[in-house]
Amino acid sequence: MALYRVFAIDILNKRKDLGCATQLIGVLGKVIYLKFVIAPDSFKGSLTAKEVSIAIKKGITKIYPKADVELVPMADGGEGTVQALTDATKGKFITEMVTDPLGKPVEASYGILGDGHTAVIEMSAASGLQLVDENSRDPMKATTFGTGELILSALDQGVTKIILGIGGSATNDGGAGMAQALGAKLLDPKGNELPLGGGFLDRLDRIDVRGVDPRVKKTKILIASDVTNPLTGKNGASVIFGPQKGATVEMVEQLDQNLKHYTDIIEKDLNLAVKEIPGAGAAGGLGAGLIAFTNSQMKHGIDIVVEYSLLKKRAQGADFVFTGEGGIDHQTKFGKTPYGVAQATKLVAPTAPVIALAGNIGKNIESLYQSDAIDVIFSTPSGAKPLDKAIKDSPQDIELVAENVARLVKTTLAAKE
């Protein structure tokens, strides 16, 4: 009923001036102007945000072949953020050979946005858990050095701002490796530089930042993260995230103590208290390292992507908004793409229904409807099937759901004539 209400009332009664450039001939011969904005996240393990967008567009244009369709592939600051923002702004991709979490060379890519002075980096490209075989994971030795190398590469491109997504790390070094790559010296009592990795931070005696690249402090870094954990303690980086990175119970205890010592030295030598800052524990403490060694600010990932993709501008005049991701549940309200897209587009196109597609719909989604953001959620799989088959069929299934929604739009509009 809600879907019929928003389609019929909002579009036909409230939208007297649809104002879109594409003319569509309705089922009764009346000229109708419709604009569809398509802004999904990726379906992880299946399709990128761009591929999901294309599948939705195919379904819509089967019914409305001349529709004004605006594709805005999205992300929430994690996986896919570089692709989404670089594509959205017609930027370019840069690939560098950097240091992976365990010190081996690895190719990592980042984006330069269309403005030419903003870079977008995912720390996981250089320091991510996916780069380390499950049997080789070692948060005692894992380093964010490669992330620092990507930052330096971006500075060499002449950027003045960096968007840095910090999800999916293999590390627990408090951003120490990143700082070392940028030129900081982490010294033991004998004046020797520490080896890379969070397991050696207990040896830290002093920090010398005189060698840090001077461009670092002149460059604004936006940290895209929704993690609010402090650096240490029962809710800190080591305790909450260490085990998934391979930390044993003993390692967790040592890593947590090492990070506490690390922050004590930061406070002594840099005059900064970072231990309890919300988000300092993100990405194995990289949040703390960025705050300590760079000119940085934390911001919700989806808010950054909404801003830099120009979603609000591109959604002006929208009649329908499609979003989605692989799974939607009650936690989607907390920084996930579908909810962020819905909130943003409602500000500029308040009568446009927001239609979310998901590979899996979880429990307790009623709160998403009650929030006056997402209007309706559809599951995309066409019947029960094995996971590998569901993944393979994702493009066709998404296209079919989008086509059926477009048919419903057309039927509802015809009924109001």
Features from the language model and the residues they span:
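Phospho-regulatory, low-complexity terminal regions
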Residues: F7, I32-Y33
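Intrinsic-disorder-associated, low-complexity terminal segments enriched in Asp/Asn/His/Tyr and depleted
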Residues: Y4, D10-N13, D17
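N-terminal loops that bind phosphate or other acidic moieties
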Residues: Y33-I166, A170-E417
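Cationic, low-complexity basic patches in intrinsically disordered or flexible, solvent-exposed regions
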Residues: L24
